């Protein structure tokens, strides 16, 4: 009896179960927990290592290929027998279904691509594609093109309608293990034994228009090259949204790169041996990986962590592949068995989608989106602006959340990280409430006005637009803060309870079409203004005092400079006198001393003026330091 242990993480209640698999049986003999992956079917027929497996898009079959040079097609209906395609000479490395499920493509050691009709009595079309073994293939999203990767260090694009060669991608310095076409059919990614991942630009519109009238060759260009891996790149994949590139390597690692910013955003030390294959769930939430350490691992890309580990008696697990709906995934390896697993992710995905569609209120604190509390999306810092008269500070009122979502930057990626959003200029409150001001007493905050306040929203992993109005309401429920305001943190029970107590006595806001308004009987309380506002008021008052002192001193300096210049002119006029009596000479001698002192004072005063000008450009602290030093010198 072969034994497979399925170890799940805390997401699956941290339970471990075991299932015993017979050599030819396709049933599970031991009950497993509800949300754990479970073996559904196993197919035996190959005589050598299984190298690749793929699902029929209509979920009628699963195809597998092997080093025994045979392609098997396994039917899920028990009454239908499997059939096999024979024709390759040597190992078959890859098998793929076309998007419509009517064609099966296979390639291998014999340097050929074979296109099979998905019937028992199949006709085969042969494309002599490369000068070396063909390692992998990828269909375009519309099924019209096929990309092949080869040991001849190139990738080639083929038009399936007439089996015609379109273009070649040359740039790698070693075998090309994997190539894939992006979902929007504009990019091609490739991974090679030269430890690099390359990204290529490809415009399919040029293929069918401009270049098809010439020689059907496509002008391509290499966009970028990534060399983060330390060993052979075994496979590359595009994320379903087309913004990220996922690569696996023999260096035991899996890396996810944002192709818009060319930045590495996730990195996993995935296996204890080389990673042979990866597959992305259609939702983009989960990633499956297979390695030579006898393990299959499932990763939650939203949380950035491993959630399942499946142990197998296969020394090398060479392939893993999700089906089109994400309900199943297939694996194969050195035991020559093609295994089909039920993911049981549907319940987890339903829970996620249900939370995204609705919000739950507890003590006037709303939370939503995958268990992330809504209050963790808010920061208690304020955004302030100084009035033209420099006598008031206005705390900008809350902005409309819809524009915040629409104006977010391209560097934001729904991968579990928190990003700052761009500010919106569209107000959420009505015009009457925008004009509402909280007039503070002159003794407490001299010359200061406070208008509203604002919480700056940071976006977490929110993709469903249905919960935006709920977040607007959650944001505006927290519009009035107090002196005991604390920073939000999702992992602190104490802070959560304090937040709930803080907001429990605050007024409800009425939300209508994304616009939040105060109740008619509500009057904001001045004494509950945030302590941060007090700090702003005190700081600005100190700045005003320092500026007044600085201006007075600069005025005195200018007067002294004028007096010194007048004394200097008077002394020069006296020197032009031709005859002087002894008494006048004594007077001139006195003027000379005064002139020397005045020149020195004039130079010093001008230096002080320059110092003040430089200090004013730097900061108020430097100005104050210059004032104190000059007063001490005098």
From Swiss-Prot:
Location relative to the cell: Cytoplasm, Cytoskeleton, Cilium basal body
Main location: cytoplasm
Keyword vocabulary terms for this entry: Cell projection, Cilium, Cilium biogenesis/degradation, Cytoplasm, Cytoskeleton, Repeat, WD repeat
Pfam families: WD40
Region of interest: Disordered: 1-40, 397-439
Disruption phenotype annotation: POC1-deficient mutant cells display a temperature-sensitive lethal phenotype. Mutant cells also exhibit reduced basal body frequency, basal body organization defects, and loss of oral apparatuses.
UniProt biased composition (Polar residues): 1-35, 397-407
Protein name as annotated: POC1 centriolar protein homolog
Organism: Tetrahymena thermophila (strain SB210)
